[in-house]
């Protein structure tokens, strides 16, 4: 048995214990698949409350129950702001959920996904179809490489860049650095925009504020928006957009088939509670 699951009173549990002040446990039915990649331990489990779950180094990343919320929010919001996106880059997002949502836009010509760990993509496509959709769209190009190095080699290339990173721990920490956001800016076309997840403003307020501030120092326009993702610690999750030109939702009527995003969500997600308005 791996070090992330344990038997308690005869039941199998996944125990997240990477935080000093908070531990979260999930009772699971079985381990569907797991492997140790060159970068991390990758595991798919079947949990009682949240269904099939992608776990990286013992930390839940997405589930078949609520993964659509995060993936729809990190994808449809920026693609509803840019009026004529043709070329999209996704950095990270190995569960393929963001790419699956982006593929719903027929006007997109290219969806490049740069994921450092091929094992995450392989296991998600095989064992997590509720999130990955077993993606097979020919416009999606999987590039197994370091996203930070990739964008340095591709200047003025993309209309929209989606940074679907894990939490800022280990090799993912660099995806929250100001220098990385500058490289993203340089990789975008003159009217391009980017989005990244900026953590829970409840449990990680400093990171949310720092991310919003760093992007605001580089991009002429930046906005914070929120969604509720039950499996993420703190539940309330934030996303930050940085844009060279476009600021507002341009679609008159949202017509994509989704479970969470609709016309009302496109607008209301930018309405922030008072405690968040203090630093935005």
How would you describe each model-predicted region?
Residues 2-13, 62-193, 203-212:
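The AdoMet/dcAdoMet-binding core of the Class I SAM-like
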Residues 2-43, 213, 234-280:
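SAM/dcSAM-binding transferase cores
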Residues 55-56:
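A general beta-strand register signal
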């Amino acid at each position: 048995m791996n070090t992330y699951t344990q038997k308690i009173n005869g039941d199998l549990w996944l125990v997240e214990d990477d935080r000093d002040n908070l531990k979260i446990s999930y009772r699971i039915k079985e381990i569907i698949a797991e492997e140790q990649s060159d970068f991390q331990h990758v595991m798919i489990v079947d949990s009682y409350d949240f269904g099939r779950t992608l776990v990286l180094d013992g930390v839940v990343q997405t589930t078949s129950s609520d993964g659509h919320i995060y993936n729809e929010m990190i994808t449809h919001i920026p693609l509803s702001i840019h009026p004529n996106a043709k070329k999209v880059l996704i950095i990270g997002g190995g569960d393929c959920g963001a790419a699956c949502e982006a593929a719903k836009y027929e006007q997109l010509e290219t969806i490049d996904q740069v994921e450092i760990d091929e094992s995450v993509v392989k296991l998600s496509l095989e064992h997590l179809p509720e999130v990955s959709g077993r993606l097979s769209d020919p416009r999606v190009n999987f590039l197994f490489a370091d996203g930070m190095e990739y964008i340095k080699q591709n200047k003025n290339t993309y209309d929209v860049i989606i940074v679907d990173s894990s939490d800022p721990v280990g090799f993912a920490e660099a995806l929250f650095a100001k220098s990385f956001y500058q490289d993203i800016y340089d990789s975008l076309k003159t009217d391009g925009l980017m989005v990244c997840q900026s953590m829970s403003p409840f449990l990680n307020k400093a990171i949310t504020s720092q991310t919003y501030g760093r992007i605001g120092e580089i991009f002429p326009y930046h906005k914070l928006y929120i969604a509720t993702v039950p499996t993420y610690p703190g539940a309330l999750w934030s996303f930050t957009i940085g844009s060279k030109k476009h600021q507002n939702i341009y679609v008159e009527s949202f017509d994509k088939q989704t479970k969470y995003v609709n016309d009302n969500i496109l607008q209301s997600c930018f309405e922030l509670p008072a405690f968040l308005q203090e630093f935005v």
